[in-house]
């Protein structure tokens, strides 16, 4: 795991500076995020509070009736330690109103609906407080497509999108995220008893090492096998990365003009300012 070890103090300064500068570029001073009680959102809350000041950070916990009460307790713990603005908004009435019309929906559809309901709440708070929405998906999740398009993957700014889950743990330790949050099993908490690693079928530490070699170091299949990764595992992960690529792109626009958005018409976020 040597390749995944990071200089946490340097990483902290980079990400804090990134949040501060990108929010400033938009002409704003505040940020809003979903605080789930998990380690990813907790880390983003810590980074945002340092970058913008706790008074400029708005966190929402949005439980559903099947959510683990521990999740809300951990989210509240993080918010209270940081002194950020905090609110709990129950999404059960909105979600259940829809599923009364489609009662046969499976867990995946229900989970996606919950994630998108939370996204609409965050963007409403963004409008209410003139605050930029911060993403909380890490690099592992983004590469695997382990998230809901236009749900938890939706944000204006993602400070941790280029660090693997293993590195999220490292930086969280260094920044003093509560032990209860760091040590619990990762879970999207979309249905009772759900855990990320059980659903994925492998551990984050296993897949992070493979993804690092595959993506960052550009090792080919034979090189990965020579390092001890099984061919089945390599093929499974490569398939997940390839099949979820559409989640990492803007909607594809049919090109019919000389300058097409996101192809020939590309400018930095602070263009013209």
UniProtKB/Swiss-Prot annotation:
Catalytic activity: deamido-NAD(+) + NH4(+) + ATP = AMP + diphosphate + NAD(+) + H(+)
Residues binding deamido-NAD(+), per UniProt: 116
Alphabetical UniProt keywords: ATP-binding, Ligase, Magnesium, Metal-binding, NAD, Nucleotide-binding
Record-level GO BP terms: NAD biosynthetic process
Residues involved in ATP binding: 34-41, 136, 165, 187
Pathway: Cofactor biosynthesis; NAD(+) biosynthesis; NAD(+) from deamido-NAD(+) (ammonia route): step 1/1
Entry keyword Nuclease: no
Subunit (UniProt): Homodimer.
Matching PANTHER family: GLUTAMINE-DEPENDENT NAD(+) SYNTHETASE, NH 3 /GLUTAMINE-DEPENDENT NAD + SYNTHETASE
Name of the protein in question: NH(3)-dependent NAD(+) synthetase
Organism annotation: Geotalea uraniireducens (strain Rf4) (Geobacter uraniireducens)
Species classification: Bacteria, Pseudomonadati, Thermodesulfobacteriota, Desulfuromonadia, Geobacterales
